[in-house]
Amino acid sequence: MNFENKLVIIETSSKKYLSVITSGQEFVTNEGKIKFNDVKQLPMSIKSSTGKIFQIYTPSYKEFILLMKRGPQIIYPKDVGAILVSANINSHSKVLEIGTGSGALTLFIASLLGPNSEFYSLDVNRKNQYRATKTISRYLSNYSPEFIKEIKFINKDLSVPEPWRFFENNKINNETYWVSYLPSISQVQKISESLNNNGFKHIEIKEIFEREWVVKGNISRPKHSMVGHTGFIVSGRFIL
């Protein structure tokens, strides 16, 4: 099987790397090197030039997002699930994303939408949109699902830091789910008030904390480090 240009995770004993299989090339780490021509299947194990065993496999969404090259701060995987559920995104959705950023959330939304969905992603920075386009095509090219045919990237500023300003020149008149991802509580107060004033119901404000546990035999304990506050998720629903 030809794995040319296949996006993969190469996992050594100490680190994970995101790479693309390229015929005739080698992947070099401080634990040795491997030849991409030796990759015959996925997943598989390969012995490096120093005798170390490397695992090679297709990246999950979480692995890809955390290891990819990025510009602006990403929305972390722990928050993505809550955002998608709050927005009720499915294969028939029409989605407007304000603030493309590095494309982490854009990617996951795109993977959920169907061929008849509509998806518009706005950003004032064209570099962000170019980066996001590469991010999405690079990840989804690993698969062949019936995902959305096209994402329409629009170069426009709708004030990501002040989402309440959206309602100054726009009016919601169809059933709509709204989700904002914000770093500060002062922003949360303003957008929640604005949603209330513009007819939104079921307004929720939450933040997601993620703490892993270690389980070894009869001993169980939480890990000493955890992923705490990364942003507030504010959601609401406009019902006619």
Can you describe what each PLM-predicted range is?
Residues 67-80:
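Conserved SAM-binding loop and adjacent beta-strand
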Residues 90-101:
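Conserved class I S-adenosyl-L-methionine
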Residues 116-120:
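Short beta-strand element of Class I
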Residues 1-58:
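N-terminal auxiliary segments of SAM/dcSAM-dependent transferases
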Residues 122-164:
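S-adenosyl-L-methionine
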Residues 85-90, 112, 170-171:
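Glycine-rich helix-loop-beta junction characteristic of Rossmann-like nucleotide cofactor-binding loops
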Residues 102-115:
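Conserved SAM-binding loop of SAM-dependent methyltransferases across substrates and taxa
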